[in-house]
């Protein structure tokens, strides 16, 4: 994964998590953590964060993960990196558009945040390396 893609991925993840810190009505556990670290002033922009910023940052993280696949060609890493942003998007849209129960939407959103955070830590500890050439993978000769 290139340095630009990794930076954009981290920006998307941090933006989604910090955005959830401002939403006391939607995500009380994240908002209480945000208030504890001094981000309580963000609550005045709760509507902006829930309607726009969280979906934008989660989409940025998802697109950066999908773009990273073109450089490392590891479908397992791409799949794990995509689960978190997709869950966060389903949770936030389920809450704002009322197609999910409020408690279920929160659980899905929090699960997405945790998965995004854990995959981000994993990516920092064990960065992706290219497994295949861009034109395809060579298969080993069969053993006789």
UniProtKB/Swiss-Prot annotation:
Membrane topology label: Multi-pass membrane protein
Effect of residue 26 to S: Loss of activity
One Pfam family, short name: MerC
Periplasmic side: 43-46, 100-103
Principal cellular location given in the protein's record: membrane
InterPro entries (alphabetical): Mercury-R_MerC (IPR004891)
Function: Involved in mercuric ion uptake.
Swiss-Prot/TrEMBL keywords: Cell inner membrane, Cell membrane, Membrane, Mercuric resistance, Mercury, Metal-binding, Transmembrane, Transmembrane helix, Transport
Residue intervals on the Cytoplasmic side: 1-21, 68-78, 125-144
Residue numbers binding Hg(2+): 23, 26
Induction: Constitutively expressed.
Transmembrane domains' residue ranges: 22-42, 47-67, 79-99, 104-124
Species per Swiss-Prot/TrEMBL record: Acidithiobacillus ferrooxidans
Record-given protein name: Mercuric transport protein MerC
Result after altering residue 97 to E: No change in activity
GO cellular component: plasma membrane
Keyword Lipid metabolism: no
Encoding gene (name): merC
Gene Ontology molecular function terms on file: mercury ion transmembrane transporter activity; metal ion binding
Activity control note: Inhibited by the thiol-modifying reagent N-ethylmaleimide (NEM).
Record text on subunit structure and interactions: Monomer.
Compartments in which it is found: Cell inner membrane
